[in-house]
């Protein structure tokens, strides 16, 4: 595996109030047609990144409904493609095993990530709205020899 993208979609979205009462923040509608999560996945797909893990936690079903098995982004594959990663509980710490934040989600999934052995790991949020070709960013990263 060359590049593995981790899309962090597990936050509560509590500041959104009633909008996230029954759905995860990344599943919120945007411009009447899209969901916030669409932007992250579209950027990845248009950048040629097709190993995508979505880390979920709160109101998971709303995320699963948006993901539709990865079909809208041509990520529904037998090898690679979309993988939905539930919270990993390692001990009795925290709130019933929930991740305490982004860094904790990465730490809790370190074994899964290590087993996948990607050359590069791209970590992104599921609720940001922007357009970016990650292949340009990755090429610059490799050119500079950055860690």
Tell me what each language-model feature is.
Residues 144-147:
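A short, conserved acidic/glycine-rich loop-to-beta-strand motif
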Residues 1-7, 15-129, 134-140:
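Conserved N-terminal catalytic core of the sugar/cofactor nucleotidyltransferase
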Residues 12:
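Glycine-rich FAD pyrophosphate-binding loop
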């Amino acid at each position: 595996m060359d590049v593995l993208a981790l899309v962090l979609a597990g936050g509560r979205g509590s500041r959104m109030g009633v909008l996230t009462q029954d759905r995860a923040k990344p599943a919120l509608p945007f411009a009447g047609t899209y969901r916030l999560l669409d932007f992250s996945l579209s950027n990845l797909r248009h950048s040629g990144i097709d190993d995508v893990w979505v880390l979920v936690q709160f109101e998971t079903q709303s995320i699963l409904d948006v993901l539709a098995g990865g079909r809208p982004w041509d990520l529904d594959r037998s090898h690679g493609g979309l993988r939905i990663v539930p919270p990993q509980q390692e001990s009795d710490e925290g709130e019933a095993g929930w991740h305490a934040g982004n860094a904790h989600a990465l730490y809790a999934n370190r074994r899964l990530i290590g087993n996948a052995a990607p050359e590069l790991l791209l970590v992104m949020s599921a609720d940001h709205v922007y357009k970016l070709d990650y292949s340009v960013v990755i090429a610059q990263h490799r050119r500079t020899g950055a860690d």
